[in-house]
């Protein structure tokens, strides 16, 4: 699996135990206790289970309101897929910090640096893989869309860095292929869909977010181009 270091636990399994356990085993135990179907989910798991505001007064912040509406939409969408035996994990506000190599043009050399940020939403699907969503409350695509795309670039950088540090080469290639086919989406629930000539291919607009059915139509359309993920890689991503 991830091959992460051994950690000190709060107790000993038996008198012969030194109190240490490997990270993979402890993570799997936690997931088994809290999400019994995590290897092949048949239910939708919201993580955290309720929307957590980023501000003390979420009613005063339009960004929080918009994220909350999309959180609710994803939850209802996920629940609707359970009838088809299709489960998933939907993670909100996941902070990441990964080390990446970056080319310094002035000094003409590779340098190591941190990429930090927050995934607005990450959807982990046992067949379609990982999908990043960045949510913007703006009523127009001007500036905010390109800003969200930069955030999605960081989302993808963080996952590639995680894969490079923790996964074998074969799985790293699968991660890269998955991100190439499904690089992430900008969600703008308050912005009407632009005309066909101006509409970005990775945009989700007001018309797509009005009902569970409209979002399901968008999903059915876009998910056709997503790469099927294998179970071992899915398990690694859930454990992340």
For each of these PLM feature ranges, what is it?
Residues 1-240:
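Intrinsically disordered, low-complexity Ser/Thr/Pro/Gly-rich regulatory segments
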